[in-house]
């Protein structure tokens, strides 16, 4: 076996705590780094594919939630590849295709924003994760996708989310970062793996290893990039023990980084009881399969089809796999939309990972910036190369506790996080991780892409919590004397003006106009092609396991 054979490392038998594996770059990782420095090898990892999915609420000029339907000028939310909706009809989702460079991804995202802003007819995009003024669940319109079975399934699924968790929670917005090492990287790694290891298995096992290591360090991403320490009182009119009053219209948590990632945001007690293991692709798929086939009594009380209307797709713990919330998702290749994610993962393995930890960055018009993506990519390559023992029950509890602590009080001076049965100061541990990331950043930086600078830029935020996005937002609120709603509405106006002032790329505009038109035609064709009743369609969809 050639030098670098250690680059293949299937799930080990060791169940040591992660603390023993995150004291910087491990010896085995150094072997992999040395391999990547070999001529012709290092450039492979730099050609990974990156994509972004970014959500934003449409709001009226005075900052209220839009009640208008999805603009026809943007095409069909069901069939458009780049412009769709998430939970609400007002919650736009921008989806970039995968690109081999972060600047290309952000350039495409900016083009999408410019296109949309010119077609909002006076509306704005809300630039923060926590929503605008919301006075009642009923004010949040569920996304509509037309009369096709696929479109109805999407709408009923969202109706079920509203019954289960409340519509307000589903109006929270975020940024997802998708990442996949290039095919050539896996081929090179395959040459150094045991000869009997199929490429698909090698790829899936390393991507699951990456996912485990990301979960071990997701607290750091929450600390560095959380940008939701405050919210409009209309979101939680009854308050919460974590929240204090900043002004008559604003709740805040003094040391919070991301209320979105806290128990005020996406967390819920039913999903908290789920044990979806990342220790192997088989365990992950089996865990999801159990959740989408096991009835939850409290959801059964809601009913499925009541008085001729579907309230939810079913009464199971998860209606479909996408209902499961995690900070990272292993994903199959995008392709057949009628194929369930668990089926696709079992058949084809893991193609990429979806990072779901990012709040919208209100300082950037597209909600995320180059430094953030470069840092995330560096972290993911690190997670790919580092040892990744299985995650046991004790470590999983520590991981969850770390994420929650970082979200609720990450900027608290001297905050300690659970680590390997002991405690570690957040700032000291963060510096340790940044030191370990430096070598990976240097490798990625050989083409002068700014990865080292992106990693080093985070040291200021570690040394000074006020320099984090959450710290800066709170300081801005205090300095302005404005409520959260007033301050963010002003940012929304400035972002809108920014995109309207950008030069028009005529070729891109024509391309997106054509896509919008063709997507509307595609939706109509889909509606005409249905031959099954909705009940038959659901039965067929859920019959494939």
Q: Each predicted region: which residue ranges?
A:
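Loop-rich catalytic cores of soluble enzymes, especially ATP-dependent carboxylate-amine ligases
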Residues: 37-38, 146-167, 171, 179-346, ...
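Terminal catalytic/cofactor-binding subdomain
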Residues: 10, 14-162, 169-175, 202-212, ...
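Short conserved micro-motifs at the rims of enzyme active sites and ligand-binding pockets
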Residues: 67-70, 106, 139, 189-190, ...
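A generic structural motif
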Residues: 60-61, 96-105, 183-185, 359-368
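A glycine-rich phosphate-binding loop feature that marks nucleotide/adenosyl-phosphate handling sites
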Residues: 131-133, 231-235, 396-407, 451-462
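Extended, compositionally biased alpha-helical segments that mediate assembly or anchoring
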Residues: 447, 451-545
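Substrate-recognition/cap regions that form aromatic- and gly/pro-loop-enriched pockets
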Residues: 345-347, 353-444
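Histidine-centered divalent-metal-coordination microenvironment in nucleic-acid enzymes
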Residues: 55, 169-182, 352-359
């Amino acid at each position: 076996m050639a030098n670098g054979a250690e680059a293949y490392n299937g799930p080990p038998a060791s169940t040591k705590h992660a603390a023993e594996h995150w004291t910087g770059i491990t010896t085995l990782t150094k072997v992999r780094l040395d391999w990547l420095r070999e001529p012709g090898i290092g450039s492979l990892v730099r050609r990974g594919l990156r994509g972004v999915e970014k959500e934003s609420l449409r709001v009226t000029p005075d900052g209220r939630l839009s009640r208008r339907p999805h603009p026809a000028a943007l095409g069909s939310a069901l069939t458009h590849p780049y412009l769709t909706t998430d939970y609400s009809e007002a919650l736009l989702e921008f989806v970039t295709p995968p690109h081999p460079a972060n600047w290309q991804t952000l350039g495409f995202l900016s083009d999408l924003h410019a296109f949309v802003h010119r077609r909002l007819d006076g509306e704005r995009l809300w630039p923060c994760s926590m929503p605008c003024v919301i006075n009642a669940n009923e004010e949040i319109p569920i996304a509509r996708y037309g009369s096709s079975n696929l479109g109805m399934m999407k709408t009923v699924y969202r109706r079920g989310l509203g019954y289960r968790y409340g519509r307000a929670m589903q109006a929270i917005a975020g940024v997802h970062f998708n990442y996949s090492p290039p095919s050539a990287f896996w081929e090179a790694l395959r040459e150094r793996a045991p000869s009997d290891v199929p490429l698909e298995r090698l790829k899936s096992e390393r991507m699951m290893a990456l996912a485990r290591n990301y979960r071990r360090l997701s607290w750091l991403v929450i600390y560095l990039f959380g940008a939701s320490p405050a919210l409009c009182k209309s979101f939680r009119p009854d308050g919460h023990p974590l929240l204090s009053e900043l002004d008559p219209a604003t709740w805040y948590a003094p040391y919070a980084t991301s209320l979105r990632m806290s128990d005020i945001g996406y967390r819920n007690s039913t999903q908290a009881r789920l044990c979806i293991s990342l220790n192997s692709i088989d365990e992950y798929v089996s865990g999801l399969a159990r959740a989408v086939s096991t009835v939850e009594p409290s959801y059964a009380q809601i009913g499925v089809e009541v008085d001729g209307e579907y309230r939810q797709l079913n009464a199971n713990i998860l209606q479909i796999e996408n209902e499961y919330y995690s900070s990272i998702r292993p994903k199959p290749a995008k392709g057949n939309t009628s194929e369930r994610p668990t089926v696709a993962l079992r058949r084809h393995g893991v193609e990429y990972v979806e990072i779901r930890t990012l709040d919208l960055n209100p300082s950037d018009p597209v909600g995320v910036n180059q430094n953030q993506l470069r840092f995330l990519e560096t972290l993911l390559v690190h997670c790919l190369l580092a040892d990744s023992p299985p995650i046991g029950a004790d470590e999983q509890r520590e991981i969850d506790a770390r994420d929650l602590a970082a979200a609720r009080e990450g900027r608290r001076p001297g905050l300690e996080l659970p680590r390997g049965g002991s405690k570690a100061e957040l700032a000291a541990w963060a510096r340790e991780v940044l030191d370990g990331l430096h070598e990976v950043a240097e490798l990625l930086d050989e083409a002068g892409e700014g990865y080292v600078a992106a990693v080093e830029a985070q040291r200021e935020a570690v040394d000074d919590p006020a320099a984090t996005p959450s710290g800066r937002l709170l300081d801005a609120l205090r300095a302005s004397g404005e409520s959260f709603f007033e301050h963010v509405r002003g940012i929304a106006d400035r972002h809108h003006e920014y995109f309207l002032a950008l030069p028009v790329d005529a070729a891109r505009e024509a391309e997106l106009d054509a896509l919008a038109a063709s997507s509307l035609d595609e939706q109509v064709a889909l509606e005409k092609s249905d031959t099954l009743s909705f009940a038959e369609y659901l039965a067929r969809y859920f019959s494939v396991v």
